[in-house]
Regions:
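Alpha-helical hydrophobic helix detector
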Residues: 1-13, 27
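Short amphipathic secondary-structure patches
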Residues: 16-23, 31-91
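Short, charged, low-complexity patches
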Residues: 25-26, 104
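Short acidic-hydrophobic sequence patches enriched in Asp/Glu that either
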Residues: 28, 47, 99
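Small-polar (Ser/Thr/Gly)-enriched, low-hydrophobicity segments
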Residues: 78-116
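N-linked glycosylation sequons
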Residues: 104-456
Length: 456
């Protein structure tokens, strides 16, 4: 009887030891997968280096002929799996012939990407899509629809060089000289990347009226420094695609103002922008804040030889010119995917509703199936208006949000969409405007919460 009790006690001690080390190994595997996934899709080797480092820092060094092994698997461009096996010595079970015990644990981590904005395909703001990509010159007044590319809350009416009216309200605190970024997402097996810009130059004529389908404008025709010179910088993929400020520049090209233009221009070289085979990754197109005054609208499209068509979309935010055919447009807003379930979708729109006074105008935020979502909203407009959660149809009549932010919050609890369909998770925004059929505006969208998570 005593022998049985001693055997049971020995087994209990070793079982607890095995359980403790299993828990430790699981924590190490979780840390390794989370550390590795942030390197995808650009650097699988970097993912392995970081995963091995995380495992070691959690008590399981990965060395040649060591007790612990780590095997990585790339399940998707944002999913990283780690299998870890370790061997531990036993205590009392040695007497029963079990000198060591092997433990196996696995962990899969997912990096939740920033939401894709504005386009589900290889184009952004092209003819016939109801909107254009856009950017305003640095010395354009903020109320003209671009809070980030413009320095000025107001400008002077004097002739001479472009400048802000610092005697009134001062410079725009939201200004950023780097402007906007667009992603050109290239898949494995692609080659010969071609990036084209539709009407890259500001095209306006000297009587102040639009001279192209993009309806480009100036507001200070008497300035000696006027018009917009737009620059496009194509940046190479790197290991941190969502931290775009350290990417290596592939090429850059500037386009000064011209009188008329309605053509596609291949960026940087012809016939392709980047010749040869391409690794999977995210090329970036940067449009920095240009001199001097006015607005420039343009379209973007990308193509490759071999492999699927690239994806082109706004990163973090998009500054656009909505060009409505009739009194209603329903452009794509953002791709909200199943992994965003349980989080909050925050949508900020600046200067929405450049409509004629006393004409009906409203917007609706739509699920992929066309149903209106529920949202709450606040604004820094006159009156600092707000509304509790309810159907997200917001009246924008009489320029209600002129020169102001409209900030919406949308709860994604129990959210589902069909990711197997090309447009199955793409939300839209319906813009109804019975008066003036265009709007210069800027949209910012994000998913709140930790972008890293463990998945089964």
């Amino acid at each position: 009887m005593l022998v049985l009790l001693l055997g049971a006690s020995a087994f209990a001690v070793d079982l607890g030891w095995i359980f403790l080390n299993g828990s430790r190994l699981q924590r190490a595997a979780d840390s390794a997968s989370l550390a590795g996934v942030v390197n995808l899709p650009v650097s699988p080797s970097g993912a392995l280096v970081d995963a091995v480092d995380a495992a070691g820092r959690n008590g399981f060094p990965i060395v040649a002929n060591g007790a612990t092994t780590l095997t990585p698997s790339i399940l998707a461009d944002n999913r990283y799996k780690v299998d870890m096996t370790t061997t531990i010595d036993t205590f009392f079970l040695k007497a029963l012939g079990f000198s060591d015990f092997e433990i196996f644990k696995t962990s899969t981590a997912e990096y939740i990407k920033p939401v894709r904005l504005g386009s589900p395909d290889h184009t952004f703001g092209v003819p016939g899509s109801n909107f254009w990509a856009a950017i305003n010159g640095q010395f354009t007044e903020k109320q003209q629809g671009d809070p980030y590319a413009t320095r000025c809350l107001t400008t002077t009416f004097d002739t001479g060089g472009a400048r802000c009216d610092t005697s009134n309200e001062g410079p725009d605190g939201e200004f950023r000289d780097w402007g906007y970024f667009y992603v050109i997402e290239v898949a494995e097996g692609s080659s010969n990347l071609k990036v084209e810009i539709y009407e890259p130059s500001q095209a306006v004529n000297d009587d102040g009226s639009p001279s192209s389908d993009t309806s480009e404008q100036l507001w200070r025709w008497d300035w000696t420094e006027r018009f917009v010179t737009t620059t496009f910088k194509l940046l190479q993929p790197d290991e941190t695609p969502f931290a775009p400020f350290d990417n290596v520049e592939q090429c850059s090209e500037s386009f000064p103002r011209i009188s008329t233009s309605q053509e596609w221009e291949t960026l940087c070289s012809d016939p392709v922008s980047v010749p040869g085979s391409l690794d999977a990754g995210m090329w970036l197109l940067n449009i920095p804040s240009p001199p001097y005054e006015g607005t420039s609208m343009f379209g973007i499209q990308a193509s490759v030889d071999g492999g699927p068509a690239p994806k082109v979309y706004g990163l973090f935010d998009m500054s656009i010119f909505v060009n409505i055919d009739g009194d209603e447009a329903t452009p794509f807003l953002a791709e909200i995917r199943p992994e965003h379930e349980g989080k909050t979708f925050e949508l900020d729109i600046f200067d929405m509703g450049d409509n004629e006074i006393n004409t009906e105008a409203w917007i609706e935020i739509l699920y992929p199936n066309g149903d209106v979502v529920d949202c709450s909203w606040t604004s820094n407009n006159v009156g600092n208006e707000s509304a509790p959660t309810g159907p997200c149809r917001i009246d924008i009549t009489n320029q209600r949000f002129n020169d102001a932010w409209l900030k919406m919050e949308i709860d994604l609890d129990n959210y589902m969409c069909d990711i197997t369909q090309p447009l199955g998770c793409w939300w839209k925004i319906k813009i109804h405007n019975e008066g003036q059929a265009h709007d210069r505006t800027t949209w910012t969208a994000r998913i709140t919460g930790n972008p890293l998570r463990l998945v089964p």
